[in-house]
Protein backbone atom coordinates (compact mmCIF):
# COMPACT_ATOMS: atom_id res chain seq x y z
CA UNK A 1 0.00 0.00 0.00
CA UNK A 2 2.81 2.36 0.86
CA UNK A 3 4.36 1.80 -2.55
CA UNK A 4 1.26 3.12 -4.31
CA UNK A 5 1.15 6.17 -2.05
CA UNK A 6 4.77 6.87 -2.85
CA UNK A 7 4.16 6.58 -6.60
CA UNK A 8 1.21 8.96 -6.36
CA UNK A 9 3.36 11.44 -4.47
CA UNK A 10 6.08 11.20 -7.12
CA UNK A 11 3.63 11.66 -9.99
CA UNK A 12 1.96 14.49 -8.07
CA UNK A 13 5.32 16.15 -7.53
CA UNK A 14 6.27 15.69 -11.19
CA UNK A 15 2.95 17.13 -12.38
CA UNK A 16 3.38 20.09 -10.05
CA UNK A 17 6.90 20.69 -11.40
CA UNK A 18 5.68 20.49 -15.01
CA UNK A 19 2.94 23.02 -14.26
CA UNK A 20 5.44 25.32 -12.58
CA UNK A 21 7.71 25.13 -15.64
CA UNK A 22 4.83 25.87 -18.00
CA UNK A 23 3.87 28.91 -15.94
CA UNK A 24 7.46 30.19 -15.80
CA UNK A 25 7.90 29.65 -19.54
CA UNK A 26 4.65 31.48 -20.18
CA UNK A 27 5.71 34.45 -18.05
CA UNK A 28 9.15 34.66 -19.68
CA UNK A 29 7.90 34.01 -23.22
CA UNK A 30 10.29 31.06 -23.59
CA UNK A 31 8.90 28.38 -25.86
CA UNK A 32 9.56 24.69 -25.21
CA UNK A 33 11.35 24.60 -28.58
CA UNK A 34 13.74 27.38 -27.52
CA UNK A 35 14.43 25.58 -24.26
CA UNK A 36 15.09 22.32 -26.14
CA UNK A 37 17.45 24.11 -28.57
CA UNK A 38 19.29 25.66 -25.64
CA UNK A 39 19.63 22.23 -24.03
CA UNK A 40 21.05 20.76 -27.25
CA UNK A 41 23.54 23.63 -27.60
CA UNK A 42 24.67 23.22 -23.99
CA UNK A 43 25.22 19.50 -24.59
CA UNK A 44 27.27 20.24 -27.73
CA UNK A 45 29.55 22.67 -25.90
CA UNK A 46 29.93 20.83 -22.61
CA UNK A 47 30.70 17.46 -24.23
CA UNK A 48 33.86 19.02 -25.70
CA UNK A 49 35.25 19.18 -22.16
CA UNK A 50 33.31 16.60 -20.14
CA UNK A 51 31.46 13.34 -20.46
CA UNK A 52 27.94 14.01 -19.17
CA UNK A 53 24.74 12.08 -18.59
CA UNK A 54 22.63 13.65 -21.35
CA UNK A 55 19.48 11.78 -20.34
CA UNK A 56 19.61 13.19 -16.80
CA UNK A 57 20.48 16.75 -17.90
CA UNK A 58 17.85 19.28 -16.86
CA UNK A 59 17.55 22.85 -18.11
CA UNK A 60 14.87 25.08 -16.62
CA UNK A 61 13.99 28.71 -16.37
CA UNK A 62 12.96 29.82 -12.92
CA UNK A 63 11.55 33.10 -11.75
CA UNK A 64 11.42 34.64 -8.33
CA UNK A 65 9.68 37.96 -7.95
CA UNK A 66 11.12 40.10 -10.77
CA UNK A 67 14.20 37.96 -11.52
CA UNK A 68 14.50 35.14 -14.03
CA UNK A 69 17.30 32.56 -13.90
CA UNK A 70 18.49 29.74 -16.13
CA UNK A 71 18.99 26.65 -13.99
CA UNK A 72 21.00 23.76 -15.43
CA UNK A 73 21.59 20.46 -13.65
CA UNK A 74 24.25 18.60 -15.64
CA UNK A 75 25.48 15.31 -14.19
CA UNK A 76 29.19 14.93 -15.02
CA UNK A 77 30.50 11.41 -15.57
CA UNK A 78 34.10 12.29 -16.41
CA UNK A 79 36.27 15.33 -17.15
CA UNK A 80 38.34 15.09 -20.32
CA UNK A 81 42.02 15.68 -19.62
CA UNK A 82 42.82 16.99 -23.08
CA UNK A 83 40.77 18.98 -25.52
CA UNK A 84 41.07 18.58 -29.25
CA UNK A 85 41.57 21.99 -30.87
CA UNK A 86 39.34 22.52 -33.87
CA UNK A 87 40.87 24.40 -36.81
CA UNK A 88 38.91 25.99 -39.62
From Swiss-Prot:
Family annotation (Pfam families): MinE
Superkingdom of the organism of origin: Bacteria
Annotated protein name in UniProt: Cell division topological specificity factor
SUPFAM superfamilies referenced in this protein's UniProt entry, alphabetically: Cell division protein MinE topological specificity domain
Keywords for this protein: Cell cycle, Cell division
Organism of derivation: Carboxydothermus hydrogenoformans (strain ATCC BAA-161 / DSM 6008 / Z-2901)
Residues that span the membrane, as ranges: none
Reported function: Prevents the cell division inhibition by proteins MinC and MinD at internal division sites while permitting inhibition at polar sites. This ensures cell division at the proper site by restricting the formation of a division septum at the midpoint of the long axis of the cell.
Cited InterPro entries: MinE, MinE_sf
GO biological process, one term: regulation of division septum assembly
Homology family: Belongs to the MinE family.
Name of the gene encoding the protein in the UniProt record: minE
